[in-house]
């Protein structure tokens, strides 16, 4: 347990140093996605952002060599039920086909063509969803603890502020 906490501390320090560094926003985002994928054992990381009118566009991706993630999709394709389900306060949405899931969770997994999915939406100042950061196909089947989900929520919140700046 001590080794895991030490590893997490090093990861968090490195992550926050990067976000506070002088690198380009694109480099910060790509390296952050890569590090989160590595640390939490996800095969894919991605960022979708809206054009403000009709579509969500795939802006960054890690591990999507098979091109299974949609390059774009209409906002209306992500139903209100999906959006509400993924908009859990103080924690990201997480579902895995290995878990006992609701039909809505399975529908979200099917929509993204993945076996497991972690997503945190981000909003503009008016509360409108302008994008989301996600990770898919986790190799580790150990469920996340509430503390881990809250940590990920905070990390992705910091990263989402960097992403929103470029809009």
PLM region spans:
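A short, aliphatic-rich beta-strand micro-motif
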Residues: 115-124
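Helix-loop-beta substructure at the N-terminus of cytosolic sensory domains
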Residues: 21-59, 67-69
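Amphipathic alpha-helical regulatory segments at dimerization interfaces
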Residues: 17-21, 30-39, 84-85, 108, ...
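Signal-transmission linkers at sensory-effector interfaces
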Residues: 1-27, 38, 165
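Signal-transducing coupling segments at domain and membrane junctions
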Residues: 92-116, 137-138
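Acidic/proline- and glycine-rich, intrinsically disordered low-complexity segments
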Residues: 67-93
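Regulatory loop-to-helix N-cap segments in sensory/regulatory domains
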Residues: 2-3, 137-154, 162-166
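Sensory beta-strand/linker motifs that couple input domains to effectors
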Residues: 126-137, 161
